[in-house]
Design a protein with these regions (language model features):
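N-terminal Sec-pathway targeting helices
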Residues: 1-12
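Exposed, flexible binding/inhibitory loops of compact, secreted disulfide-stabilized domains
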Residues: 6-8, 18-168
Length: 168
């Protein structure tokens, strides 16, 4: 009885080590950028170079309205182009950025970054909590790009988005 209990504990610990390698929380620099909503666009990408960032920007500029914003409305944020100005070739020598693309069924929703984890088999999971500051939400669709600064990320095989809060 005691031996099988010990084996159970050892197997549980081994599983925890195999499937979770680090959880990186809100001490990372995070930017929440309100962009256009595009159906079936939700996901996570990793950007490891200035060239990759410019390619993403150029391919998706019109699709998500990723330009800069001179005037910022009370229900909006800076533009994506404004947000990425600081990420030059020097930044990417030792760092990466993670971009989480979110789809929401209300422009009233806001977000809290809960962190990301990378497991031993190379799956990166970003956790975002959706909130609403008021009792009522609008019925307009909204898109968001969440930019997360991190140390260099290599050997990532797959990315996942875990949304909590209003989506539970």
């Amino acid at each position: 009885m005691k031996i099988s209990f010990k084996i159970s504990i050892v197997l549980s610990l081994f599983s925890a080590l195999l499937f979770t390698s680090g959880f990186y929380a809100s001490n990372d620099s995070i930017q929440f950028i309100k962009t256009n909503w595009v159906e079936n666009s939700e996901g996570v990408i990793i950007v490891n170079s200035h060239k990759e960032l410019l390619a993403y920007y150029n391919v998706n500029l019109k699709k998500f309205s990723l330009g800069s914003r001179e005037k910022i409305a009370s229900d909006s944020t800076i533009g994506f182009a404004n947000a990425i100005e600081k990420y030059d070739e020097e930044y990417f020598k030792n760092s990466s950025i993670i971009i989480a693309i979110l789809e929401e069924n209300s422009g009233s929703y806001r977000h809290k970054y809960d962190g990301y984890s990378v497991n031993k088999i190379g799956t990166l999971t970003v956790s975002i909590k959706t909130t609403c500051d008021s009792d009522y939400a609008t019925c307009d669709m909204a898109g968001w790009h969440v930019i997360i600064e991190t140390n260099k990320l290599d050997n990532i095989k797959e990315t996942k988005l875990c949304k909590t809060g209003l989506h539970q």
